[in-house]
Design a protein with these regions (language model features):
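Amphipathic, small/basic residue-rich leader segments at the start of a protein or domain
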Residues: 1-125, 144, 148
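Glycine-rich, Trp-frequent "lid" loop and neighboring beta-strands that shape
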Residues: 94, 102, 144-183
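Short, well-ordered loop/turn and helix-capping segments at boundaries between secondary-structure elements
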Residues: 20-21, 118, 135-143, 155, ...
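N-terminal glycine-rich flavin-associated loop
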Residues: 125-143, 170
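Residue-level "edge-of-site" marker
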Residues: 98, 129, 166
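Short acidic, glycine/serine/threonine-rich loops at helix termini
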Residues: 103-108, 135-139, 171-176
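Contiguous, well-ordered alpha-helical segments that form the cores/surfaces of helical PPI scaffolds
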Residues: 106, 110-114, 131-136, 162
């Protein structure tokens, strides 16, 4: 089984250095965020990543997600782990409280993302596009669209996706041809 120990103390060192930055401390929305709260969050994050997500790393590497007869089948253990992941509120860590988020600084969610990536990158990728979709909607959508989509995304009931326009790959770069001409 793979081994991973979340570097909580290193993360706390970084958080405390950032927290001591006067500009960061002056942000009203983070007035209640302190080292004790962040350490508690990171210690819980370490537990879920080391005890629940890490054991899935091999399963995710060896059992790809497949579409069978219109049904998506994920690697063994993923469905249960994702249910626990959303039940514990990890999808909402740095999301706006207006939509059900916890309102933590992006720094805290970056620490969690590092743990999640280290424990099982394949599992992390299930939520990755949702974060991007959440950010896109929260920064650019109308209030009506935000009210419709963001609460369900924050709750983990709806997820985001990437819509690729190229039929053969995720980018057109592979279709480019270059030629070197001596000058």
């Amino acid at each position: 089984m793979p081994n991973y120990t979340a570097p909580v103390e290193d993360m706390m060192f970084l958080f405390d250095k950032l927290r001591n930055n006067k500009n960061y401390n002056d942000l009203e929305k983070y007035k209640e965020v302190n080292s004790e709260l962040v350490k508690d969050i990171l210690e819980e994050a370490a537990k879920i990543n080391q005890n629940l997500i890490l054991p899935l790393a091999k399963s995710g590497d060896e059992n790809p997600t497949v579409l069978e007869n219109g049904v998506v089948r994920t690697p063994p253990g993923y469905k249960e782990a994702y249910s626990k992941y959303i039940e514990d509120g990890w999808t909402s860590l740095s999301c706006d409280p207006k939509y059900g988020g916890q309102g933590m600084p992006k720094t805290v969610s970056a620490f969690f993302d590092e743990m999640l990536s280290s424990a099982s990158l394949s599992f992390k990728l299930y939520s990755e596009l949702s974060i991007g979709a959440y950010n896109c909607i929260s920064h650019h959508a109308t209030d009506e669209i935000k009210e419709k989509y963001l609460p369900k995304m924050v709750e983990g009931k709806w997820s985001g996706t990437m819509c690729l326009t190229e039929p053969v790959c995720g980018t057109d770069l592979g279709l480019l041809k270059t030629k070197a001409i001596e000058q």
